[in-house]
Amino acid sequence: MSLNIHVIKDKILSENWFVLRNMTYELTRADGSVVRHKREVYDRGNGATVLLYNRHKQTVVLVRQFRVATWVNGNHDGMLIETCAGLLDNDEPEACIRKEAVEETGYEVGEVRKLFELFMSPGGVTEVVHFFIAEYSDAQRTTSGGGVDDEAIEVLELPFSQALQMVADGEIRDGKAVILLQYLQTSGLMSGNSDKSD
């Protein structure tokens, strides 16, 4: 379906943290009909996320931190278990996840594998998230992690089977984490032990 888009108004409502804009636009459909819409669009930049996994130990590394938006929407303590992630700012996606992995988890990852790029909330948020996986070993842990400044991130090294059960039980509710854990499950990467030693 081909659409012709004509922006009527694009007004910035806030630039306090990221950019919130109010847009009025018309869509001309393939049949020639025109529909006018008014929407708010939140531009927070693009991001990247990585799931660290160890085939030999059958473990994954996740993080737990407070997310105020989840608390507002009924998450009783606001704590969320997630994959390591961050906004790109001016970095390339791979550079971003390497930096975030050290800051949040303490691991300096080696080879990383990019899987895909996804819109996570396309109804009103512009962000595209770049998804990665990377194998880790105990020898790659150079710091305790925990994030920077006041992030207070808890690092969780969990058995892969436990992480999958936590998804099934609703304990892991972060979309990034669910997608990457299920990818790891269906890919067969965790079906056998790695030849690498820790």
Curated annotation (Swiss-Prot):
Binding-site list for GDP-alpha-D-mannose: 38-40, 67, 85-87, 104, 127, 150-151, 176
UniProt enzyme class: hydrolase
Motif Nudix box positions after renumbering to this chain: 86-106
Annotated EC: 3.6.1.-
GO MF annotations in UniProt: hydrolase activity, acting on acid anhydrides, in phosphorus-containing anhydrides; metal ion binding
Keyword Chaperone among record annotations: no
Nudix hydrolase domain boundaries: 43-180
PROSITE patterns on file: NUDIX
Record key words, sorted: Hydrolase, Magnesium, Metal-binding
Positions that bind Mg(2+) 2: 100, 104, 151
UniProt entry tagged with the keyword RNA-binding: no
GO biological process: nucleoside phosphate metabolic process; ribose phosphate metabolic process
One Gene Ontology term, aspect cellular component: cytosol
Reaction(s) the record says it catalyses: GDP-alpha-D-mannose + H2O = alpha-D-mannose 1-phosphate + GMP + 2 H(+)
Cofactor(s), names only, from the UniProt record: Mg(2+)
NCBIfam families registered for this protein in UniProt: nudix-type nucleoside diphosphatase, YffH/AdpP family, PRK15009.1
Domain notes: In the dimer, the N-terminal domains are swapped between the two monomers, such that residues of both chains contribute to the active site.
Family: Belongs to the Nudix hydrolase family. NudK subfamily.
PANTHER family per the UniProt record, alphabetical: NUDIX HYDROLASE DOMAIN-CONTAINING PROTEIN, UDP/ADP-SUGAR PYROPHOSPHATASE
Name of the protein: GDP-mannose pyrophosphatase
